[in-house]
From Swiss-Prot:
Primary role: Component of the ubiquinol-cytochrome c oxidoreductase, a multisubunit transmembrane complex that is part of the mitochondrial electron transport chain which drives oxidative phosphorylation.
Membrane side Mitochondrial matrix: residue ranges: 1-39
N6-succinyllysine: residues bearing it: K33
Gene Ontology terms: biological process: cerebellar Purkinje cell layer development; hippocampus development; hypothalamus development; midbrain development; mitochondrial electron transport, ubiquinol to cytochrome c; pons development; pyramidal neuron development; subthalamus development
Designated name of the protein: Cytochrome b-c1 complex subunit 8
Modification Phosphoserine occurs at: S16
Pfam families xrefs: UcrQ
Oligomeric form and interacting partners: Component of the ubiquinol-cytochrome c oxidoreductase (cytochrome b-c1 complex, complex III, CIII), a multisubunit enzyme composed of 11 subunits. The complex is composed of 3 respiratory subunits cytochrome b, cytochrome c1 and Rieske protein UQCRFS1, 2 core protein subunits UQCRC1/QCR1 and UQCRC2/QCR2, and 6 low-molecular weight protein subunits UQCRH/QCR6, UQCRB/QCR7, UQCRQ/QCR8, UQCR10/QCR9, UQCR11/QCR10 and subunit 9, the cleavage product of Rieske protein UQCRFS1.
Keyword Amino-acid biosynthesis: no
Gene: Uqcrq
Record localization: Mitochondrion inner membrane
């Protein structure tokens, strides 16, 4: 009647190759090469990435402190009120 799912149509002049899911490995060299590579890349880029984040954090905390201080009332203005 029809073709099975995955082979629904046939396209001329197109060659496709596939690997069986049983022959694939989900995480090849994940622990032996992947994690050390992440550590190496992090070590190489930390001096380029960290300073802007530190600067942003300092500006952000300073801004929050200034905002909180600007919302408080100044007691010196109300010393002579009765």
């Amino acid at each position: 009647m029809g073709r099975e799912f995955g082979n629904l149509t046939r396209i001329r002049h197109v060659i496709s190759y596939s690997l069986s899911p049983f022959e694939q490995r989900a995480f090849p060299h994940y622990f032996s090469k992947g994690i050390p590579n992440v550590l190496r890349r992090t070590r190489e880029r930390i001096l380029r990435v960290a300073p802007p984040f530190v600067l942003f954090y300092l500006i952000y905390t300073w801004g929050n402190q200034e905002f909180a201080q600007s919302k408080r009332k100044n007691p010196a203005k109300y010393e002579n009120d009765k």
